[in-house]
């Protein structure tokens, strides 16, 4: 099977010779496609794959190993190309041996040069020392290549301790430039060194020979004397006689000096007693000194004295010392109890706690005082948190309402929180948000907000020291050096056992903090069993969205401070869950309050119309929503580690429904405004743009609004809401990352269009019905009969009255909104044309004059309102004309044209409004 690539070919290696472990660079062709493709690399028969580093298809770097062959090829094997070949070779040099006393830049493995096992416990032969310069003359290293020397002296060595030593090689390598005279001197030195080595041991033996003989003679004489005395039977041997003599001499001496020795012993005893009192005054005074130093608080002095006494008298058997040492131990036990009591006192600083723990550690107090301190601090923190809640609840019962605790603005540790609150509070909410509010509102903190502020400050004042105390307990810095060394194993065991317990303590503090905040702000999220302990707040009113945002920022800063202590995230996750719930609650409350404020916008409607036929209501509505969303920006935005408030589908749906309800509340306000009785609306003036040249007439300030005018104003507002406001609000929702925007827009638009259509139909009914109703009466006024009538002299008055009424509608609509004119007039004309068609179709027959009169009036009306005709009205006019007989002669057509021109000329001024340029007819 042929391979996909050519076999590797090594064409170069640098360097091409060296000792084992020399780093070489191999170059060639097809050396592999990657590190995993390289499966073999041998140099001089030694596998170097472990040290190989594949650089590219033409380069590999490795180290030469301990090969057996002095010279060999470089073979590369790859998966893709198989076993390769080499055009170059590498020569492996033997490493130069370094003498015992020679300086070397690398660490020398002496076991490779000397066999220490064979040299142990015996003299070192002279040759094993291998002097660095056996000839005794200056060494000058040869500059000839080692390779040439090896070729010249094949199989030989320059090492003079080697079996294949070559003197010529040695001289060429070390003394190539040495003169012959110096070499002769070197031979003399070499002979002298050899003689010294052979004569040294002989001289040592000769010098001590007489001493050896004298020692031998003495030992022989002693041996002979002992053997001779051993045969005698008088008073035993010589040693027994010597013992008797010595005993008699001792007894005689005691008798002579008994009195003197007695006095000496008594003096020595007295002197020793005084020395003991002076020497051990430290121990005898120590119990009293311990009491005094404890009273002064010099615990370090007491501990040092105790350690000294313990080392001197801890294991004494002297009764006096044991008595006084027992008193010392009793005083130290009292000190242990005192220090433990001070350690467990609360409140206490971290410095004092560490100091007392170190004292107790030095005194080898039983148990684990450091852990007892941690437990006491934990209970104290929980008690402070509960007391904080009870204190605020008592304050709330004693000082309800306006007497709320004030925020300490000057001493607050978190100015950014108050800055955020001030920035949020300063948002202008339009006219509807300014009533009944003064500048002092931001300094009146609700009780529950003040409670959260104080609670978080309390936790941040206690927990850092609590955490640092645990860290010191873990790393052993609480204990002294001696205590750390003596109890290190036991303490490590305790730390492993205490880790889970401490984790539970931290979690208990976190749970208590979160539940207390939930009890104050989110009581519905507590379990039934926790409600009494953590809840119980008398909530008179729901917190505003701004205060909730302030609380969220406070808790966020608390979380950041706890994270800075390097507390594990799993212990702080419960705070993140609380922040998420508060963010969702803040959004809900803000949107609900926004809906309430928008509901009150109807009370602020002033009915002042601008040039576009709009009041300030749509703008106020948009501003209200925009300011609400701006106040929620910091709440909706996610801080590091926080989840999105819209991650849960349930939350998305609730927020979407609240947004829809806000839009529908405003739509309901518009409907209420359109149907409100005249007496309930203050419309003492109506302001319009009187500068428009198309205005039919000026409206004075004392003009009262009618129900039809209110309908028109609301319709104009509806049109603006549909084209601009609702779309702008959708963009603001999207900008603030709200979800379900399409649904909000669709539902809101549908409700708005429904209201618009209903109000439009009401207005058309109010305006079109009277005009339509007057047509039939006007046509048949004066017993007019289509079968028997005079030749037409012009358009009759009923049609002129209808046109005047239509002009009045035009004027009324134009006064409010120019854009509504085509839509309203088109529907009115549809109704009029439909009625006119019906009346014409009901006539059984027309006379020649009657047909001409009817055609004149229908054409006059149609031509007058031509710019407002719709397909429906054109169809009605067509049906009306089709119901008439055709004109009999050209004279009738001429008469019809003359009468039409006369009508248009006589009513030119009145019909001007129908001739003005008009936008495309709007929807009906």
Swiss-Prot record:
Keywords: Acetylation, Coiled coil, Exocytosis, Phosphoprotein, Protein transport, Transport. One of its GO terms (molecular function) is small GTPase binding. It comes from the Eukaryota. Residues 240-260 form a coiled coil. The modification Phosphothreonine is found at residue 440. Its main location: other. The modification Phosphoserine is found at residues 431-432, 435. Interacts with RALA through the TIG domain. This is Exocyst complex component 2.
């Amino acid at each position: 099977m042929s391979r996909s690539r050519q076999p590797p070919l090594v064409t170069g290696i640098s360097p091409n010779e060296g000792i084992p472990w020399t780093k070489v660079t191999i170059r060639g062709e097809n050396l592999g496609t990657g590190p995993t493709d390289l499966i073999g690399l041998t140099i001089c028969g030694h596998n170097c794959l472990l040290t190989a580093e594949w650089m590219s298809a033409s380069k590999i770097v490795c180290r030469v190993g301990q090969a057996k062959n002095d010279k060999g090829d470089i073979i590369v094997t790859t998966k893709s190309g198989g076993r390769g070949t080499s055009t170059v070779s590498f020569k492996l040099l033997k490493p130069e041996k370094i003498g015992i006393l020679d300086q070397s830049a690398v660490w020398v493995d002496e076991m490779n040069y000397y066999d220490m096992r064979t040299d142990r416990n015996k003299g070192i032969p002279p040759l094993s020392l291998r002097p660095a310069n056996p000839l005794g003359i200056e060494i000058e290293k040869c500059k000839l290549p080692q390779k040439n020397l090896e070729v010249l002296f094949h199989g030989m060595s320059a090492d003079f301790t080697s079996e294949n030593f070559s003197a010529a090689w040695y001289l060429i390598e070390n003394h190539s430039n040495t003169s012959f005279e110096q070499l002769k001197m070197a031979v003399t030195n070499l002979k002298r060194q050899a003689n010294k080595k052979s004569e040294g041991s002989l001289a040592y033996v000769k010098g001590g020979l007489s001493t050896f003989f004298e020692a031998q003679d003495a030992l022989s004489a002693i041996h002979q004397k002992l053997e001779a005395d051993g045969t005698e039977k008088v008073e035993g041997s010589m040693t027994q006689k010597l013992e008797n003599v010595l005993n008699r001499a001792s007894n005689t001496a005691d008798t002579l000096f008994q009195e003197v020795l007695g006095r000496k012993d008594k003096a020595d005893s007295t002197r020793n007693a005084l020395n003991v009192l002076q020497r051990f005054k430290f121990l005898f005074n120590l119990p009293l000194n311990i009491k005094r130093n404890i009273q002064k608080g010099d615990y370090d002095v007491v501990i040092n004295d105790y350690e000294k006494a313990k080392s001197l008298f801890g294991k004494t058997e002297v009764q006096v010392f044991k008595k006084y040492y027992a008193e010392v131990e009793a005083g130290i036990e009292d000190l242990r109890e005192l220090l433990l009591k001070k350690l467990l006192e609360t409140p206490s600083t971290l410095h004092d706690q560490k100091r007392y723990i170190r004292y107790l550690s030095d005194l080898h107090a039983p148990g684990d005082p450091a852990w007892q301190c941690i437990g006491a601090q934990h209970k104290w923190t929980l008690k402070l948190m509960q007391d904080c809640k009870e204190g605020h609840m008592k304050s709330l019962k004693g000082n309800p309402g306006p007497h709320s605790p004030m925020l300490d603005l000057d001493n607050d540790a978190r100015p950014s929180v108050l800055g955020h609150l001030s920035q949020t509070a300063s948002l202008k909410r339009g006219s509807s948000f300014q009533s009944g509010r003064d500048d002092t509102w931001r300094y009146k903190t609700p009780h529950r907000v003040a409670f959260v502020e104080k609670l978080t400050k309390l936790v941040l004042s206690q927990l850092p020291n609590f955490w640092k105390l645990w860290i010191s307990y873990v790393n052993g810095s609480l204990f002294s050096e001696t205590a750390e060394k003596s109890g290190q194993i036991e303490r490590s065991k305790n730390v492993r056992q205490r880790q889970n317990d401490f984790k539970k303590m931290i979690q208990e503090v976190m749970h208590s903090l979160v539940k207390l905040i939930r009890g104050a702000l989110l009581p519905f999220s507590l379990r039934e069993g926790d409600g009494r302990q953590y809840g119980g707040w008398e909530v008179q009113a729901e917190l505003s969205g701004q205060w909730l945002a302030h609380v969220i920022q406070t808790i966020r800063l608390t979380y950041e401070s706890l994270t800075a202590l390097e507390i594990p995230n799993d212990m702080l996750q419960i705070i993140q869950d609380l922040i998420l719930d508060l963010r969702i609650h803040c959004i809900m409350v803000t949107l609900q309050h926004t809906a309430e404020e928008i509901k009150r916008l109807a009370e602020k409607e002033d009915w002042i119309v601008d040039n576009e036929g709009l009041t300030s209501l749509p703008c106020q509505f948009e501003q209200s929503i925009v300011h609400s969303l701006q106040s929620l920006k910091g709440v909706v935005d996610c801080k590091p580690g926080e989840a999105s408030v819209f991650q849960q589908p349930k939350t998305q749906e609730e927020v979407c429904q609240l947004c829809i309800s806000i839009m529908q509340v405003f739509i309901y306000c518009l409907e209420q405004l359109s149907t409100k009785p005249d007496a309930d609306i203050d419309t003492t003036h109506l302001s319009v743009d009187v500068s428009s040249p198309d205005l039919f007439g000026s409206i004075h300030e004392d003009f009262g609004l009618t129900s039809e005018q209110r309908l028109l104003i609301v319709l104009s507002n509806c049109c603006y809401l549909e084209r601009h406001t609702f779309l702008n609000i959708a963009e603001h929702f999207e900008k603030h990352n709200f979800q379900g925007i399409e649904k909000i827009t669709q539902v809101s638009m549908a409700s708005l269009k429904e209201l618009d259509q209903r109000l439009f139909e009401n207005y058309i009914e109010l305006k079109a019905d009277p005009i339509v109703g007057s047509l039939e009466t006007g046509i048949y006024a004066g017993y007019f009969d289509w079968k028997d009538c005079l030749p037409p002299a012009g358009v009759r008055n009923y049609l002129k009255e209808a046109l005047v009424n239509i002009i009045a509608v035009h004027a009324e609509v134009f006064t409010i909104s120019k854009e509504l004119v085509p839509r309203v007039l088109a529907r009115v004309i549809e109704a009029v044309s439909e009625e006119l068609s019906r009346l014409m179709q009901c006539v059984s027959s027309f006379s020649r004059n009657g047909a001409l009169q009817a055609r004149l009036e229908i054409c006059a009306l149609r031509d007058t309102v031509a710019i407002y005709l719709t397909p429906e009205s054109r169809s009605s006019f067509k049906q009306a004309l089709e119901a008439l007989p055709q004109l009999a002669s050209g004279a009738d057509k001429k008469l019809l044209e003359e009468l039409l021109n006369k009508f248009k000329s006589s009513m030119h001024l009145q019909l001007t409004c129908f001739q003005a340029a008009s936008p495309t007819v709007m929807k009906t």
